Every structure is written in C-alpha cells, then in structure tokens.
Amino acid sequence: MNAYNLQKIGITERGDAGIDLSWSSKMNSVAFAIIITKSVNDKFIKELLKHKGKVILHATVTGYGGTVLEPNVHDYKWSHAQVLKLIEAGFEPAHIVLRVDPVIATTKGNAVVDNVLGLFEDTGVNYPRLKSQASKAKFTRFR
C-alpha cells in the first residue's frame, strides 16, 4: 500500500454491504471504511471480522422489518441478535453506529424507536443515528 492509499477512506453507499460482500476485497486499498448494511448476517460477520479495527459499521435497523413498510428486511430483534453475535466475536461496539430508519413522526413511530433503542441498550453501542421522515425540530427529545 502506498502513502496515498493510507489516506483513502472507503464507504459502501450503493447496495447493501451485508448482501454484496465485494467491498471486502477492496479493503487493502483504503486506510479504513464505513460499511453500511441492513443485514448483519453470518457471512457478513465473518468478512467484517477480517477487517475489524479498520471499519466502522453502520447497522441500519428498522422497527418495521417484515411488515408492509419493510417486507424484505429482518425485524429488529434478529438484527439485535446478529449485532450481539458480532460483538461477542470481538468486534468493538465503539465501531458500530446504530442507524434507526425510518423514524415516523407518530405516537406509534416513537414507540417503535423506543423499542429498538431499548433493545440495543445491552450491546454497548453508544452511537444511535435516527433518520426522520419529519423535520428534526419535532424530535428534540432525541438530541
């Protein structure tokens, strides 16, 4: 790796890094990477652990997985179990951002966010990121 590559940052912005693992073969050409997925599956965990210390994981979790809103996404309890599996295998919780998406500005939507955040409290993940479908001003309680 040359000096230029030591300054390069990778990010998986297209597709889902938990499904398309092609990012793994490019890790030697970057200093570190931000890996984004809705699917922290077992194959993904295996690949991610090869690069631990060199990646920040953005684990997108929805409280609507398996519903009409997110029919092809795992529910948040599955995601929680998989994130715990990743941490128990040696991945640092400090290198994980919990992305709660979508946040719907309704009483039920707030309850969904509370359920997701509450379940993930035992993981040691301290960086939640909420993607609101409404103005940020309506979510002052999350600041």
Residue map of PLM features:
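Conserved AdoMet/S-adenosylmethionine-binding subsite of the radical SAM
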Residues: N2-R143
